[in-house]
């Protein structure tokens, strides 16, 4: 701000009238190397927050719930997918398999991968009832939208209308259960990170003993 007037911050980046900086500093998002590097977990957090924001907009009558249900549900689904991909990567790192996640949008396959990898570690990083509840919620979502397309387009690639058999979706009910799922998955991510740190400490100490 200069003499009470907000001005754009100087920034060295390619010119683009859409994706550029603005005078309101609080609304300038830090991206790329300026804000990260971000990982799948960070992106997932953003999509969960996006889902919550869409529901809040409906609650505040900023936008019609009949329209906001689509970006809300899509954001939640993508947030789940990104969290699961992050977990697959993290658990593979613990197991030192050298592998990562499949680059597709099959949420239930990602979940099965998480379960298998977690079992292979031989140590419970999160309580069993939490795993069961997460699996239940992911299963419900996958049964409703197995392809990740249901809330993106009104029809599938064959012209069949999505949601033809359904009449109502309460976005607050959806939000509350997505918040519950998010909490479980985030704890799992943090527990996996803590276990990896412990694992590296063990490797380091064993190396020191041999020396």
Task: Name each region found by the language model.
Residues 1-211:
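Domain-scale activation on soluble regions of proteins
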């Amino acid at each position: 701000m200069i003499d009470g007037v907000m001005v754009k911050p100087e920034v060295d980046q390619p010119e683009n009238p859409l994706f550029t900086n603005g005078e309101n500093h609080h609304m300038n998002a830090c991206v790329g190397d300026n804000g990260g590097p971000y990982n799948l977990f960070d992106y997932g957090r953003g999509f969960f927050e996006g889902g919550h924001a869409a529901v809040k907009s409906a609650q505040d009558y900023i936008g019609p719930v009949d329209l906001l249900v689509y970006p809300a549900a899509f954001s939640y689904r993508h947030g789940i997918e990104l969290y699961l991909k992050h977990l697959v990567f993290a658990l593979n790192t613990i197991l030192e398999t050298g592998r990562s996640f499949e680059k597709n949008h099959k949420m239930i396959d990602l979940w099965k991968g998480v379960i298998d990898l977690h079992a292979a570690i031989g140590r419970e990083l999160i309580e069993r009832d939490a795993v069961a509840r997460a699996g239940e919620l992911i299963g419900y979502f996958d049964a409703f939208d197995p392809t990740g397309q249901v809330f993106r387009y009104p029809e599938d690639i064959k012209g069949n209308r999505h949601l033809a058999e359904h009449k109502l979706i309460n976005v607050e009910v959806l939000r509350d259960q997505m918040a519950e799922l998010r909490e479980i998955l985030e704890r799992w991510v943090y527990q996996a990170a803590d276990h990896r740190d412990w694992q590296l400490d063990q490797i380091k100490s064993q190396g020191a003993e041999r020396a």
